[in-house]
């Protein structure tokens, strides 16, 4: 009799995805982030569901309901901080996952990569709307500033902004719809993740060498399931340390002040994981130009397959390209720092320089270096 996991129509799919899946024998810890992102998504959906049971999406009671969750609900503080810091973990893993994809040339799986970029946009949208829900000062002003960017779109801009707001300013209608979208989007993200995996399993995983690994495959279970569990333990350790010792480390103190449309905070800034894009937005004096730079700073990921001019897939044996990639990482850290600083000298200049370097490395230096490496290797 055939094993049930191989014959049952539903269990068979799970078997081919997580148990009998042939995986390259040499994939490193950099391949752990996919499963960690899946765990993060599940954690966010579960904690979010419990928060939604006690939260009220109304301007008069939203802030109080979050306070009530933290003070009166059994382990409400834990659920709330797991959800808030879980988002930070989510983005750390996302950026590491994308960085891995760039380093090892995983973007040559076009469908998987493009769905991944769309997933990034969806997660960013979800996180932004979630940040608005506690209805603190930074929630309100963050929502006002970011939604206002759409007014830079020629002709339809101002109408579009009022349509999104549901009125003439960020108010009750905005909060209600943001809650609705924040609730539904993670389920859409889950569906997209399944498509992401479907496309990945069409080609099989990439590996650190960037070479074809069909001749040397091992079953996913038990080798990589145990490896993923180790990664999961590290994640739980980090997340719980953050939640139990310094839950507000990554938050903004301004968000402990209830939203007040008559009082603007001195420095409006998003959560840390958006600061690099926010710095790029601010470094361009023109409103529309800034918005385009902001969108393109993420959308540029779509161009990686086209900009890949090297004869080798991975950067493993390309020291010059490696050097450029690490300069890009350092540059992104500088942009993140600048995004959290006030708009004054010397931060403006540093931000503009870092923005130019960011686009130059990706669009000019990396492809040029690839060609030079081909030449040096006489390919």
From Swiss-Prot:
What keywords does the record list, in alphabetical order?
Electron transport, Heme, Iron, Membrane, Metal-binding, Mitochondrion, Mitochondrion inner membrane, Respiratory chain, Transmembrane, Transmembrane helix, Transport, Ubiquinone
Q: What does the UniProt record say this protein does?
A: Component of the ubiquinol-cytochrome c reductase complex (complex III or cytochrome b-c1 complex) that is part of the mitochondrial respiratory chain. The b-c1 complex mediates electron transfer from ubiquinol to cytochrome c. Contributes to the generation of a proton gradient across the mitochondrial membrane that is then used for ATP synthesis.
Determine if Membrane is one of this entry's keywords. yes
Provide the binding site for heme b b562: 83, 182
Give the lineage. Eukaryota, Metazoa, Chordata, Craniata, Vertebrata
Provide the protein name: Cytochrome b
Q: Name one GO cellular component term.
A: mitochondrial inner membrane
Q: Which Gene3D superfamilies match?
A: Cytochrome Bc1 Complex, Chain C
Membrane topology of the entry: Multi-pass membrane protein
Gene Ontology MF, one: metal ion binding
Q: Which cofactor does it need?
A: heme b
**Highest taxon of the source?**
Eukaryota
PANTHER family (UniProt xref)? CYTOCHROME B
Q: Where does heme b b566 bind?
A: 97, 196
Where in or outside the cell is it found? Answer: Mitochondrion inner membrane
One of its GO biological process terms is: mitochondrial electron transport, ubiquinol to cytochrome c
Pfam families to which the protein is assigned, alphabetical: Cytochrom_B_C (PF00032), Cytochrome_B (PF00033)
Transmembrane segment boundaries: 33-53, 77-98, 113-133, 178-198, 226-246, 288-308, 320-340, 347-367
Cite the record's note on assembly. Answer: The cytochrome bc1 complex contains 11 subunits: 3 respiratory subunits (MT-CYB, CYC1 and UQCRFS1), 2 core proteins (UQCRC1 and UQCRC2) and 6 low-molecular weight proteins (UQCRH/QCR6, UQCRB/QCR7, UQCRQ/QCR8, UQCR10/QCR9, UQCR11/QCR10 and a cleavage product of UQCRFS1). This cytochrome bc1 complex then forms a dimer.
Which amino acids does the record list as binding a ubiquinone?
201
What more is known?
Answer: Heme 1 (or BL or b562) is low-potential and absorbs at about 562 nm, and heme 2 (or BH or b566) is high-potential and absorbs at about 566 nm.
Similarity remark? Belongs to the cytochrome b family.
Major site of localization recorded for this protein:
mitochondrion
Q: What InterPro entries does this protein map onto? A: Cyt_b/b6_C (IPR005798), Cyt_b/b6_C_sf (IPR036150), Cyt_b/b6_N (IPR005797), Cytb/b6-like_sf (IPR027387), Cytochrome_b (IPR030689), Cytochrome_b_C_euk/bac (IPR048260), Cytochrome_b_N_euk/bac (IPR048259), Di-haem_cyt_TM (IPR016174)
Record text on cofactor binding: Binds 2 heme b groups non-covalently.
